[in-house]
């Protein structure tokens, strides 16, 4: 069994530093995928992957790389769906896991919100601000996901 790999949808990810710390503790590889050259620590477990700036290029790369040994970190519901179908574990940056059971309702809610925004303009609102509790929940969830993947329970 190969070691777990954390695939990060990195362009707007607020928990990159937390990912690095947890990955180092577990000896897990991290692939930081973005459309631009983000700064990443110089560490043998961390790889920066810069994709083209084409629409969904980072999502496409992550979805192709995702498998049962992967943990994908993304707030993108459609990417989460693709990664789950590839067998990966998926976490939102706030620590909420996406699962095969929860992804359908999440996609439906996303579609409803898109329709509301289209009909009412941008005044519908978005997610709440990222909090310290979100960060703590993410750290716990990533640690637990890595343990599950290492044990083959994901």
Swiss-Prot record:
It holds the Pfam family DUF188. Disulfide bonds: none annotated. It comes from the Bacteria. Belongs to the UPF0178 family. This is UPF0178 protein Sala_2376. The lineage of its organism: Bacteria, Pseudomonadati, Pseudomonadota, Alphaproteobacteria, Sphingomonadales.
């Amino acid at each position: 069994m190969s070691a777990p790999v954390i695939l990060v949808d990195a362009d707007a990810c607020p928990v990159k530093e937390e990912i690095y710390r947890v990955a180092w503790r577990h000896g897990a590889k991290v692939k930081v995928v973005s459309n631009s050259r983000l700064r990443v620590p110089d560490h043998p477990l961390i790889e920066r992957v810069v994709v083209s700036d084409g629409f969904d290029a980072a999502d496409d790369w992550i979805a192709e790389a995702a498998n049962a040994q992967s943990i994908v970190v993304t707030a993108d519901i459609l990417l989460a769906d693709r990664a789950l179908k590839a067998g990966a574990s998926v976490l939102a940056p706030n620590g909420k896991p996406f699962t095969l059971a929860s992804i359908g309702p999440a996609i439906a809610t996303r579609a409803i919100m898109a329709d509301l925004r289209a009909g009412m303009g941008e005044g519908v609102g978005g997610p709440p601000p990222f909090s310290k509790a979100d960060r703590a929940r993410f750290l716990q969830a990533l640690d637990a996901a890595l343990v599950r993947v290492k044990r083959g329970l994901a």
